[in-house]
Amino acid sequence: MSEGKFIKKKTYYTGVVYEWNLPTGSSYPFALECKVTVDRISGKFDVEKGAYRCYAASAERFPAVREHRWKNFDLVKNSGVPTIPNDCKAIRIHMSGDFFNQKYFDMWVQLAKDNPNIEMWAYTKSLQYWVNRINDIPENLVLTASYGGRQDELIERHNLKNVIVYKSPILVPKERPIDNNDDWARKPNINFALLDNMKVSKKSAVADFNKSFSNGTLFERE
């Protein structure tokens, strides 16, 4: 059985965070708008009609990235459990990938329960697996429902914390702060926004927007 590995990240996030990643597309059972599968061997992209190629999928053009994610996938598909590093304080589950079945989702719920001092969070379109365990999620595991999947109707029905991707800050509703480093994804019960295809200048734009959000001086949007 392949040995899975976390990636230690010292930039982008607030503080040191370990990422656990799986291959795009192949581990996305309920994706719709971002359903992009990358062949493990060739790196060839298979983009479903109407889908867009996200950052996570684009990274898999590199063989080392593909192999790393597929080894993780091999591990958990065969009922393996990731070994959390000893110095880990925070885990971002799936910068790439999603909960591909109920058993795998339940594994992360149990890992969170077994490690109550480790902060864990994830975006997901696998909403049925979450709803099936909605009263069993520990406080240190924060989940965010990502709009644009095949089960969006479950978000409002079960009042799930959620995120919507927008093309411009102007389109973002007043009540949604914009996340650019996962800070809002790590907070429970707050719905937020992401910007699509954000450029290098995104941080200053998002910072200005969130400053306005915090002090109540948001600019008007139609």
Language-model features: locations:
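Class I S-adenosyl-L-methionine
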Residues: 1-222
